[in-house]
């Protein structure tokens, strides 16, 4: 069986797409938090957004790494 080559050409685009979607989800959750009176729902959404923001930090670091590697020719 032949291994697939490491094709990383579109990694930056994929990561950027995930960042955009995560930000949209945070914004939607913030809207729901503002509209709901259910404290349990608010707490759950706040916790999810905290995890999303942590994930965003990681994705931003990853995109920097990928952009640097792309510039250096994926060595």
From Swiss-Prot:
The highest taxon in the source lineage is: Bacteria
Task: Please list where the region (Disordered) is annotated.
Answer: 53-75
InterPro entries under this entry?
Answer: SASP_thioredoxin-like (IPR017524)
Give start-end of the signal peptide: none
NCBIfam families xrefs: SASP_tlp
Family affiliation: Belongs to the Tlp family.
Q: What is this protein called?
A: Protein Tlp homolog
Q: Where does this protein come from, organism-wise? A: Clostridium botulinum (strain Langeland / NCTC 10281 / Type F)
User: What gene codes for this chain?
Assistant: tlp
